[in-house]
């Protein structure tokens, strides 16, 4: 028996290599460990009043490689492609005035813009294979259309909320999470519709269930500013338990959930900066509040009245 052991080890090693290579091919990346079947994190959130704003699923395919929050005035400044719902004019040239004058896909007169990186099937050729934000920046594949988009505003679990200031700009998540070693701004949350309350920072393999991307934004405002150099310090996240840090004030908490039907076994990945290697932990989203003051006041009334 002993003479056969080396051959057994060789065969086993070959099998492992073949399986690993197959996974890499299947998922369109050399980082096959970015894909998981188990959602290893449990979501625990307090029950709070909420209001949903219907904004569609980007049926008109409003896509661009701009970022009006982080890189205003710079066409293709995102170096990856964003998907938008809400304000139909949002791009690098957007100003407060142009956004306030534009139409929107949202109901109730909400002119806000909500956007995040596109998700792609990487075994297909994309429409932008030779364009900025697409193939020229390493983001290859066919853009997947969302099955669902939920825009939800939530109240505070511990107090009444104040209205969001109009034209406040927010970002959640870290588009540089990979090179930042998954630091404190990483807030990627991937899940499956058939596993509520569980999530992962990796790509989930949901089988026939809808794949979900969720974004929670900060909800503690400094009381003065609609933006900051980092696009983060003027509105921060609440403390454990839901109270805002000192010298900040509770505003409605924006929660966005995007769902996709991904055929089982098909490779997929989000857009990212080239150096971020399309790591799922780099998922992020941006928002500019362009709600008319009266609509925001009514939203706050509903959130506070349900307490």
Residue ranges and their predicted role:
Residues 1-14:
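N-terminal export and membrane-targeting signals
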Residues 8-11, 21, 30:
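N-terminal cationic amphipathic segment used for targeting or macromolecule association
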Residues 16-28:
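Hydrophobic alpha-helical membrane-insertion segments, chiefly the h-region
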Residues 28-79, 83-215, 222-307:
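Primary mode marks residue(s) on the alpha4-beta5-alpha5 output face of response regulator receiver
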């Amino acid at each position: 028996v002993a003479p056969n052991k080396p051959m057994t080890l060789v065969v086993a090693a070959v099998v492992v290599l073949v399986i690993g290579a197959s996974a890499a091919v299947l998922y369109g990346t050399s980082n096959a460990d970015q894909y998981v079947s188990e959602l290893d994190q449990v979501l625990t959130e307090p029950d709070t009043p909420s209001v949903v704003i219907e904004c569609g699923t980007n049926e008109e395919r409003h896509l661009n490689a701009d970022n009006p929050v982080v890189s205003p005035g710079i066409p293709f400044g995102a170096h990856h492609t964003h998907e938008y719902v809400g304000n139909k004019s949002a791009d690098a040239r957007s100003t407060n005035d142009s956004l306030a004058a534009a139409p929107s896909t949202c109901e109730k007169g909400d002119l806000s813009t909500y956007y995040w990186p596109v998700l792609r099937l990487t075994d297909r050729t994309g429409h932008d294979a030779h364009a900025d934000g697409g193939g020229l920046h390493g983001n290859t594949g066919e853009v997947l259309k969302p099955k669902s988009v939920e825009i939800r505003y939530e109240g505070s679990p511990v107090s009444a909320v104040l209205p969001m200031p109009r034209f406040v700009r927010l970002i959640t998540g870290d588009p540089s999470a990979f090179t930042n070693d998954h630091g404190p701004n990483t807030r990627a949350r991937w899940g499956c519709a058939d596993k509520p309350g569980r999530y992962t920072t990796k790509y989930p393999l949901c089988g026939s269930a809808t794949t979900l991307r969720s974004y929670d934004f900060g909800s503690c405002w400094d009381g003065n500013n609609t933006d900051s150099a980092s696009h983060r310090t003027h509105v921060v996240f609440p403390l454990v338990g839901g109270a805002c840090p000192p010298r900040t004030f509770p505003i409605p908490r924006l929660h966005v959930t995007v769902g996709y039907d991904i055929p089982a076994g098909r490779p997929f990945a989000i857009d990212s900066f080239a150096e971020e290697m399309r790591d799922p932990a780099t998922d992020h989203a941006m928002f500019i509040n362009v709600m008319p003051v009266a609509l925001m006041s009514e939203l706050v009334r509903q959130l506070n009245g349900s307490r």
